Amino acid sequence: MNEIWKKNREKLLARMEMFSAAVLFAGKAPIKRGDENYPFSPDRNFYYVTGIEREDCILFLAKTRTGVEETLYIPRDNGVMAKWVGANMTAEEATAVSGIENIGWIDAFEEDFATYLFRSGIKKIWLDMENREWHGERTPALRFAEKVHCHAPQMVIGDLYPLFSDMRLIKEEWELERMRKAMDITRLGIEAMMRTAKPNQKEYEIEAAYDYTLMVN
């Protein structure tokens, strides 16, 4: 499966200029209340080139005359948090899923990035700048763009979103298969609601049948 993500990274790198780098963020689950978060869903463009579905991960890609560099940054394991939310992904697991051999720790990303930036001759940084909320919370990419402008104002910022839109416009066969499967599961969910619906039933009771069908399929 990781050949899919490798191919997608190759397609992205082919659209990037020489002496440019890309940084993509998986994102983080929004806080619901107290110590409870909403379910996490990775940034879809990050997932498209990594296959990783864990939060707080960063993908770094660079393209120079010496070749291509790929590094996936993941959180360190935390024994205390592991008891509450489970263990973090290991470096071996991250490589197995993504096909990326070079795995770093997320807390070392900014120092690694700064070191690479000033020794490699990189002239452009690509970030996924999609943002649909003027007054909403800024995305990790927008916050990182501000840091780049602050510490390296000469750097050009490119927007990855149009590149991904072009790449993902025509679906690969594996994507079509997943879409067909999603439609089949949705149909099963609707049929489950129809079978369980009764007079005077609450909406959440009917919804439960739909949600259960999706979870078990």
Q: What is each stretch, according to the model?
A:
Residues 1-188:
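A composition/biophysics-driven feature that prefers long, compositionally simple stretches
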